[in-house]
Structures are given as structure tokens and as C-alpha cells.
Amino acid sequence: MTETGSYKDTVNLPKTNFDMRANAIKREPEIQKFWEENKIFESLSQNNPGELFILHDGPPYANGSLHIGHALNKILKDIINRYQLLQGRKVRYVPGWDCHGLPIELKVLQNLKSAERQNLTPLQLRQKAKEFALATVDNQRQNFKRYGVWGDWDNPYLTLKPEYEAAQIGVFGQMVLKGYIYRGLKPVHWSPSSKTALAEAELEYPEGHTSRSIYAAFPVTSFAEAAKPLLGEYLPDLGVAIWTTTPWTIPGNLAVAVNGDLNYSLVEVSRIGAETQSNFKYLIVAADLVERLAATISAQLTVKATFKGKELEHTTYRHPLFDRESPVVVGGDYITTESGTGLVHTAPGHGQEDYVVGLRYGLPILAPVDDNGDFTQEAGQFAGLNVLGEGNQAVIDALTAAGSLLKEEAYAHKYPYDWRTKKPTIFRATEQWFASVEGFRDEALKAIAAVKWIPAQGENRITPMVAERSDWCISRQRSWGVPIPVFYDEETGEPLLNEETINYVQAIIAEKGSDAWWELSVAELLPESYRNNGRSYRRGTDTMDVWFDSGSSWASVVKQRPELRYPADMYLEGSDQHRGWFQSSLLTSVSVNGIAPYKTVLTHGFVLDEQGRKMSKSEGNVVDPAIIINGGKDQKKEPPYGADVMRLWASSVDYTGDVRLGGNIIKQLNDVRGKIRNTARFLLGSLYDFDPEKNAVQFEEMPQLDKYMLHRIREVFEEVTEAFESFQFFRFFQTVQNFCVVDLSNFYLDVAKDRLYISAPDAFRRRSCQTVIHIALENLARAIAPVLCHTAEDIWQYLPYKTPYKSVFEAGWVQVEEKWHNPELAEFWQQLRQLRTDVNKVLEQARVEKMIGSSLEAKALIYVKDANSRKAIATLNPEVGNGVDELRYLFLTSQVELLDSADKLQDGKYTSQSDSWGIGVVNAEGQKCDRCWNYSTHVGESAEHPLLCERCVPALAGEF
């Protein structure tokens, strides 16, 4: 053959139908269908040989569409579950939903006309709420499945299912029997706009809240014996100065609290420009705050005496607006000199610390405010006024009239609002049901210490929360929830709540669901013995806090389902759950069983936009997971990337803090997926005629380069394993990306093309390379499978040879061999790779200046400065080599000359010098081979193939 180009059909070019484009919008659903039809998840979770692995799902709330925070959470869970499956464990994952509570009630009410709303019975509201919750669950379930999340989607747990509610009542019943549940008056966060008590987790603290704060003085009427000698002479013109940001609570004042260890001063008041004249010649105030108070009330304050706070204990004062005397009491460390006067107005019905101090001193719990936030008759002249509006003003006016007000000023601070209605809340004592945390606090703290927290600071967050928390108010004044199964004696109001009544109600709810509490008569809900015992009962109308619902899931799901195991291996949620689900689950589990319901707790941060700002509709910076997957209205601007890109993002971020996401980040991650697909496509294409059973080369026989590559493969996949084991998925992301681009594309595969294309199909140099490629490809598919689950399966389905596994997930985790480990060889090849990089720079220079087109048109001149290195590198430039471990193949040049002195570099037109070596480039010698495009002085020597070189002639004969 003497025609140029007539040999192009004799080279082994890659062949595969694996698509370079992901085409995820079509391909991902096909792959999910393949998993479903073949029941891959079900069979692995039943038949894997390893231990059980139970990641218990924290239930998202069934009241709207999924947002990117849901996606991050469920994808992180799925990455862990899929990794555990690949490791051979029996992963049982039951997704769940939180279905009760006020937000769902509000959604239902918002959709009704006001006339319908007025006449709604609790049962009708519950029916509508249930329909809404179930519709939301279905919508969210379809979306979660589209993310590629595996789980028991046909049998999820819903907090509204009868078996769930019954188990929850069982937890409540056990806590009752252990004496942890009680009823009491207690100040709770009360929302007048929702007319219900709110949990801490249902509050938010918006920026920009301003209160009307007042300084006032209450007239002192007597001192304790010990203080009389020092302070007695200043009566009756003496007042205790207090400061409050909630003047409406003054009618509930029953004490003034001081810090026993602080210094206080008695000061004489002389007004400078008397704007408000008060009745007091003398005031008591914290010593450190005298100057600040003087400036605030525009008066001159002269210190007459100084003493410790504890000396004021048992002093009495008269309430400025009501005819009653109250004590000065010693409070706690919450009384500081950071603001106010150092004396704290104390209303046990309107504040947590006030309540605790009140209990200690036996003060009544007074809260003259009703459900709407209006003063009751107990508030006398203020009855009927709203405490957050005209009631507040009326109290300030009355204090002014009584000569008690010292100063009023606006005060900006954090104030709790109802997270749903966005309106301010109040602290108000109401009859509520409580779980006494005091009874098992120490056990709870012990349980926390026995859990593994990831990141570790999670333990430092939840520990003080549990150590300092007050008793848990578990009752809510709503109808959409699990009822507190209590009856009240119609005559005495005494609650009826015991083992017999609880078990009876539990059995009814297990059969009929919690609607029965509203549907059945009281007689039907009571055990026989209480039906005709001469008393009549009414049922309670409170439901349980939804945190008690979800906090019982360890009992309703993990313990109750036979395929699961309690305690669960892991809980994984956002870091806001230290005060939410992690804590409510811990408290119920410890109180009933004395242990935490989880062995490990992993938390992640929130998703912010690319600038690190909170996502909000008003900012227009919300990233919708559905749009990432399916694309937006304008598919040019918002293309459909599919679920794998979103999953790749979840693996790329350091989730231990807040994470960022936006259009640019997603685009970059799409490029990374593209690089991984491209690498996989080349690997697949290079194996079209390879059967590992027949063609694989033994490790011992391999050339150095291939042994080095297997060392790298072992190193890379051990690093990836370590990343998954330690839940540091960003390390997986960086390692795999680097391996595909730096080790494979830019190095090994670049060098391999000559071996793969030019050699005879069955040549040793080609089969050895294919063996490495087959190992790299199968391990790459397995390693990306927890994250890029669709891409990994796609690769596996296109393997050109038979494998015993129909899915990559059946193939198990990566497989590397100990014998591949060879640090000395690796060190030598690292040095060669550095040399290759430097040679490429010089070749590039020659290419830019048009001295050469392709690097094969060049001959490289190398001078290695260190004699030992020179000797070692010389072994890779033999007269006759093995066709692999040769510098010419490494550099992709037609020839390489190793120089014994630096002088000869002068021959090269382009040169570079470093500490280790000098490099030059000259034109290659000989003619260009028409088949492999290498230059050789032997082209033309074969009569049969005059256009070919000394490698291609034997290659065509099957000998190279």
C-alpha cells in the first residue's frame, strides 16, 4: 500500500454507545425504573451479608413543596445509605412525614371562606387537614424519589397513622406512670394571634423590633431587721427603681428581684430640669448603674449608702397601681448590671425566671390576661384592654398618674414572634401539661455523652440546652394533633389519667385513629369501671406538641417495625434540630428507656445563595431543586441538569457549616460531571474487545507504568473509602475529580492511546493497559455510586463484557489489592510525571512558535543533573524496550535523547532549566509513519509497507 491514509481502518479506535451527554431528564428516570423493576434496593437490604444499618429519617413537615434544604438533607442520607449498601450492610430506610400541627391547620383555614371557617367543627377541620397532609406527602414523595433517594417509599411512616399515634400515646403513658407528666400553671410563650401556646422552636426573632421600655419606682414600706439601721431613716420617701420592656406585665408584679452578690446604692435624687416629677426623694439602684440612671432620668443622684443585694431580702414595697404589698427577693445570675437598674420587676405569671423565683418564695402565679391577649377582671381598671396595644399605654399612663414613672424610652431588642402569623407573642401562665425534665435530666446528659456527634461541636450545642432547659410544655390548644388522653371530673375539674384509662384509649386509637377522641362519646372512651361510678367526666381538648409526635418516632417506627433495630445507628438533620427533633427524641427515649434513641448524630448547616445570603422569595435568590432537575421555563437560561448534579453538589460542600448554591455553582458541577462521564466514556470505549476472564494480564507481568497506575488506583480509592467512612464527602469529590482529570485524562490515558490504538489487538502492551483500564473503570463506577448513582449505573449498564452483577450496587464497594502498594515505584514515577510536565511546557513553547505542530514532530533532549536519577531515568530510554516504560511514550515525542552534559542543550531551539534537569527540543529525525504518525528513520524499509515504521509493520502482523 502506497496511498497515504489507507491504514486508518487498521487502528483500534474506541467504540461505545455510552453517551457523552448525560441527557439526565430522559436517562435518570429510565435508570430509576430499572432499579424499581429489578427491586435492587429491596433485595440488597434483605440479602446483603453484613450487619443491619438503620439511618432513621427525621420527618419533614407535610405542608408545602420541597426546598433545597430538604434536598441537601435527603441526599446526604442517601449517600450514606448507598455507601453502606455497597459495603454489604442491610440498609433499612423508612422515610417519614410529620403530619399534625398548626402550620397545616393554618394552610387549611387560609383556603376557606370566613363563613366556612366560623362553622367548622374540630372533626371537619381534622378531615381537611388530613387530606391536605396526605396530598403533600404524595407530592414530596414523588420528588424525593426523583432525587434518586432509595427507601421503603411504599410503607413510609406518617405521624397521622393509627399505629403511629397509638405508639406515641404509649410513650406518653409510660411517662405518666413514671411520674414525669404533670399539669400546672406555667408561663408559656403564648401567641394571641394563634390563640395557642408555642414551643421554643415555633418562635422567631425578627430584626427591628422596638419595645416601649420604662423606668419606674415602687415605694418601699419596710426593711428587714438587719437593714433598718443603715436604711431605715430614708423611709417613707424611698423607692426601688425597676426597668422593664413590657409595661403591661406590671399588673402581674408580685416581687422585685435583686442579685444577692451585686453592690447596690441608696441615692438622693435632685432633679435638674424636671420633665416628669416623681414622688421619690431617694431610690435604690445597682451601684454600677447609678451614673447611667442619672443620665437616663436627667437627675443628679448622690450616693448615701452602699450594701450587698442580699441585705435587701424581705424588704417590702407597695404596688403603685394595686393595694398590695410585695417582697424584695434574691433572684439568680440573670440579674446583671448590663442594662436597667439591677432590680428586676418580677411577675411569676409572665416570665420563666420570674416563675422559678416565685416558686422558691411561694408567690402565687398571677396572669390577668386571657387567650386573646386582653386583660381580665383581675387586672381591675385595665380589664378588656389588649396588652400589646392600648393596655400597654394605659399602664404607662396609670404609672405616670401615680408618680411612679421615672422615664419612658424606645428600646430595640430581640423579641419572640409567632413563626407562622409573624405577630408578637407574650409570656403568660396557663393550665398546661408538662413533661418534667428535672426527673431525668442527669440521665439525658449521660445519654448525650454516650452518642457520637458529627461534627463534634454538636455535643457542645445540645448539652447546655438540655442542662438548662425548663420542663417541656407538651400541650397545645388545637384540634389537629394527637389528643392528650385525659378526662376531667365535671364537678371538681380533677384530671383522670392512669394506666387503665390510657391503655383503653390507646387501644381505641390503634384501631380507629385519633379521630375517635372526637367521634366517640366520653362513655365509649372510658373503661367500663368509670362509666357508671356516680361521676361525670368531660374529655380534654388539648393535643400534644408536634415535637412530641416526631419525638416518639423511635417508638412508633424504629422499635415497632420488626425489620428495624432500636436504638438507630444514625439521625441526620439540620443543626436547628439540636433544639428540635434530636432533643425531643432524646427526652422521650431517655425518660422511657434510659438511653438515647441514636448512636450517632450528624448535622448539616443551611443552604445560602452564592453570596452567602439567606435565600428568600423577596430577594429572588431561591434555588428550586425541581428547576435544577427539570430545568426552568427558559431552558437556555435554566437547563435541566438532572438529579446527579444536585447530588454532586451535596457531596462537594462542607456541610458541617452553612453551604452555598446558585446558578454558577451548579454550572461548575455540571462540568465536573461532564469530565467524569467523558473519562468513563473513553474507558468504556477502550474495552470494546476486552474480556477480563480471558484477556487480563497478571499483576506480576505488568510493565512499571501499569504497576504504578495500580498503586495510584489503590491510593485514590482508599482515600475515597476513608472519605465515606468519616462522612467527609467533599474529600470524595475532590479525590475523584482529581483522579479523573489529573491521573487518567492528562496522564495515563494520554500516554495509553498509542498502546491502545496502534498495537495489535491482542498485544501484551495493549492487554496490560486494558487490564488497568478495566480495574480503574469498575472501581470508578463503584466509588461514584453513592453520590452519582445514576451516572454510575449508566456506566455499569454499558460495560462491554459480561459481569455477574446486573447493577453496580450489586457489585459492592471498590476492590483494590494490597500487593499494588509500592511507594518506592510511586516516588520514581512521580518524578517522571514532573519531568513530563516540564517537557510539555517546552513542547508547548515550540508549538506556539510553529516549530512543530504535534509533539510527535519533536525529539526531546534531556539532561538530568543528579547522577543517580540520571542512571534510573536512563533505564527508560533503552535501545530496545518493552513498548511501554519508555520516555518517548511518556512525553509523546518520536525520540528522546538523554545527554551526558548540559552543553548539548544548545542544539535545541527551545530549552528550559530547573534545579533537577535541563530540557531542549529539536525536530524529530526520519519520516512520519502513515499509521502511527511517529517519526522514524526506518520508514520505507519494508517493501510491503513502505509508508510504515518499524513498530507498525509487526503490529499489522500481530507481533507488536
UniProtKB/Swiss-Prot annotation:
ATP binds at K617. Its cofactor is Zn(2+). A motif ('KMSKS' region) lies at residues 614-618. Keywords: Aminoacyl-tRNA synthetase, ATP-binding, Cytoplasm, Ligase, Metal-binding, Nucleotide-binding, Protein biosynthesis, Zinc. Zn(2+) binds at C929, C932, C949, C952. GO terms for cellular component: cytoplasm. One of its GO terms (biological process) is isoleucyl-tRNA aminoacylation. Binds 1 zinc ion per subunit. SUPFAM superfamilies: Anticodon-binding domain of a subclass of class I aminoacyl-tRNA synthetases, Nucleotidylyl transferase, ValRS/IleRS/LeuRS editing domain. It is an enzyme of class 6 (ligase). CDD domains: Anticodon_Ia_Ile_BEm, IleRS_core. Its EC number is 6.1.1.5. Monomer. This is Isoleucine--tRNA ligase. It comes from Nostoc sp. (strain PCC 7120 / SAG 25.82 / UTEX 2576). The lineage of its organism: Bacteria, Bacillati, Cyanobacteriota, Cyanophyceae, Nostocales.
